[in-house]
Amino acid sequence: MAKTKIAIFGLTGCEGCEFHLLSLDELLLDFFQDFEITNWRLLSKKERADFDVAFIEGAVTTKEQIKLLKDIRETSKIVVVLGACAISGNVFAQLTPEQRKKLAPKIYDKNYKLKAEFLAPVEKFIKVDEKIPGCPPDIEVFKRILEKLKTRKIVSKIKKVAPPDFTEGIEGHGVLKINLKKREAKFVVEESERLVEGLLLGKD
């Protein structure tokens, strides 16, 4: 019997949720025995665009990320948001737009243009099936969701993806580029300021 395929994506945040999963020792070993990981940059796996379940961490901050989320929702049978940033924006949502504008020149060059356009939780843009709260995420909730996934019959959606065939989204400290037509994905590091920039994000 084929294993359920899981993809893990990070939007804008500190990536602590993903690193927290890497520290789970025996639980992580069981995780790999029961599921096939098709996308997870932290494990340096060759990423593919086919998966049944998507775990998403981080807040949404760009239009490109919205497009990525919709593509993920179209492909995935189940979407799970991981951690407080993906659920509510967490500490990144504490600054107002005015505070962000005031602080930006003190951290970056005065002519630096922030990449983030807004801040919103994942659920604002796509339907979410499960939530794992916490910063870092609640491991007991994570375990319960994994048990549900193991016992639940999951059938991959096979749908034609309408143009454009290429999309990208900011993920951690770089950009995840996905070619949906060729079913290929790669991660490109284009900047190193995502963590600090996250602290400057405000609400709509």
Where does each model-flagged region fall?
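Iron-sulfur-associated redox domains of electron-transfer enzymes in respiratory
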Residues: 1-192, 202
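Long, low-complexity intrinsically disordered regions enriched in Ser/Thr, Asp/Glu, Pro/Gly
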Residues: 198-199
